[in-house]
């Protein structure tokens, strides 16, 4: 079993990470070659999300229990919720001789970039084209105004980390962004 190629796709909320990763996995070549990482979180499930497909939703007590047992490759608290990447994803990718695509927050991406156990890691920072567009996307997701403002402030901080990522992709439209990400992922995986 060789070390899997791991891709971390990070960026501010509203940049389109989840949508792009979902569309990437509708491509046969991607499905055959990669495992999709599903994050564990304590945040409230949005109406369109499915437990086990988009995230594994747990309460804070369960999350902290898993963290104490070293269940996660990395875990972070973002705003008022915890997020964690299960170690088992990396092991399953390794065992299945597949790559791994993770859609995680910026702090988590930086933690994995420094992790010596992950030998083949490519980081991709996904950004919205403008602050106004980011705000519009968050509003469309029906987030509360107070939450949107917190996320916009967080996005400003997260954008400062884009220079540490291997790639910066601006999500102006889904079709072009998907093509660009697919080219990066398939190109780097060779």
Which residues make up each language-model segment?
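Hydrophobic anchor at the beta1->P-loop junction of P-loop NTPases
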Residues: 9
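ATP-dependent small-molecule kinase phosphotransfer cores
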Residues: 39-100, 106-108
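Small-molecule kinase domains that catalyze NTP-dependent phosphoryl transfer to phosphate-bearing small molecules
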Residues: 143-184
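The feature captures the helix immediately C-terminal to the Walker
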Residues: 21-22
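The conserved Walker
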Residues: 12-13
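Conserved phosphate-donor/acceptor-positioning beta-strand/loop module used by diverse small-molecule
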Residues: 101-106, 118-141
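Walker A/P-loop
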Residues: 18
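Post-Walker A helix-loop "phosphate-sensing" segment adjacent to the P-loop in P-loop NTPases
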Residues: 26-36
């Amino acid at each position: 079993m060789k070390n899997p190629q791991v891709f971390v796709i990070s960026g501010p909320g509203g940049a389109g990470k989840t949508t792009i990763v979902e569309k990437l996995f509708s491509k046969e070549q991607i499905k055959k070659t990669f495992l999709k990482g599903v994050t564990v979180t304590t945040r409230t499930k949005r109406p369109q999300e499915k437990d086990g497909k988009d995230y594994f939703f747990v309460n804070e007590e369960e999350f902290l229990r898993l963290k104490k047992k070293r269940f996660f490759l990395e875990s972070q608290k973002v705003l008022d919720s915890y997020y964690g990447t299960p170690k088992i994803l990396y092991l399953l990718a390794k065992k299945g001789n597949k790559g791994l695509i993770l859609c995680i927050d910026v702090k988590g991406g930086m933690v994995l970039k420094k992790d010596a156990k992950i030998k083949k890691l490519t980081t991709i920072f996904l950004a919205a084209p403008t602050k106004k567009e980011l705000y519009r996307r968050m509003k469309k997701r029906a987030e509360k105004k107070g939450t949107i403002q917190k996320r916009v402030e967080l996005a400003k901080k997260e954008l400062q980390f884009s220079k540490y990522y291997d790639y910066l992709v601006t999500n102006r439209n889904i079709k072009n962004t998907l093509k660009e990400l697919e080219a990066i992922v398939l190109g780097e995986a060779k």
